Every structure is written in structure tokens, then in C-alpha cells.
Amino acid sequence: MNKQLFISRLIREREKLELLVNRVGFTRQLTMPGVLGKWSVKDVIAHLLAHEQYLADRMEEILQGEVYLPCKTQTALDAFLDEFGYPDFGSPLLDDDTPNEWVVERYRNVSLEDVVTQEINVFASIVSSLEKMSEDLIQKHNIYERVAHGTYKHYNEHIRDIKRWFAVKAPNAKK
């Protein structure tokens, strides 16, 4: 795979999420629960933000020649959370739901604007790290698949959720 082609695809796929969020529109709608259980669009964005921050930090560690090892004890998980401010999503100790609920709760009282701004900045960090990586480093660390999984493949899961919710909340809205 060519790095520039991958970055172009990454940005194109990203635009699909941004267009959908913009179509949902008003702040009040973005914070209404029901997109995914009790989650709002804001909660989905916070969830994506935390997973992207995890990815961005691992990419930066790779660029710095550091080695990430998933947490294997609860003490290590707690220390990771204290250091990074998000769960160690790579730890085999975590189930699927607990870290996601923690993330949503962490951002509960953070404004929508701040969540969106942080998420945009983290996405830019991912693109920047990708641009800095050599093709050898990308291949050695399976970066294309990791970035795809942590960004646009993840977006697509939640785009479906948001579209389903939006179709019920605003059935006459332009699709």
C-alpha cells in the first residue's frame, strides 16, 4: 500500500463521519441519548476520541522507538489510566463495555465543543505521525491495519448507529 493513497482514503472516510455529524446539527440533538443505548452523538465522539488517542500515543511511541506492553495486572491498568487519561484498550484484562462506559462518563461534563476539538486534534496527530513514519516502520508495526481499525473502520460502525438513530429522530431530514 502507498502511504499517500492510504492517507487520502483515511481523510475521505473521515469526511463521511464529519458530514453526518454536521447533518445531525444542533448541539441539543448531538447530546440527546439513544444513538447507541444511552449514548448520544457526543458520547460516540468521546468514545472515538479515546480510542484514537490510544492509537496516536502508540504511534508516537513507535516513532520514538519505545515499546508498548499491554497491562497484565489491575495495578498496571490503574497506573496506565492515571498516566494517559484513558484505559489501556490493548489489555487482555479489559472487557468491551467497561472501558467504553468509563470514557463516556469521563467526558460527561466536558462540553461538546471541547470533545469535538480534542477529537479533531487527535485525528490530526494520527495523520501527522503516519506522515513521519517510513514505509519500513509502517510495515513492521502493521500501521495501515491498526490505523484503519482505529479510525475509519471504527467510524463506519458508529456511522450506522447514528444514521439509524437520526432516521427515527428526524425522519424527514435530507439523507
Which role fits each region the language model picked out?
Residues 12, 16, 118-121, 125:
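Charged, amphipathic alpha-helical oligomerization/scaffolding segments
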Residues 89-101:
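A structural motif
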Residues 28-32, 107-116:
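Short helix-to-loop capping/linker segments positioned immediately adjacent to catalytic or ligand/cofactor-binding
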Residues 1-16:
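Extreme N-terminal tail/first-helix region
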Residues 2-5, 85, 99-113, 138-142:
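Acidic/His metal-coordination segments adjacent to aromatic residues that form catalytic metal sites
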Residues 28-88, 120, 124-175:
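Short, contiguous alpha-helical
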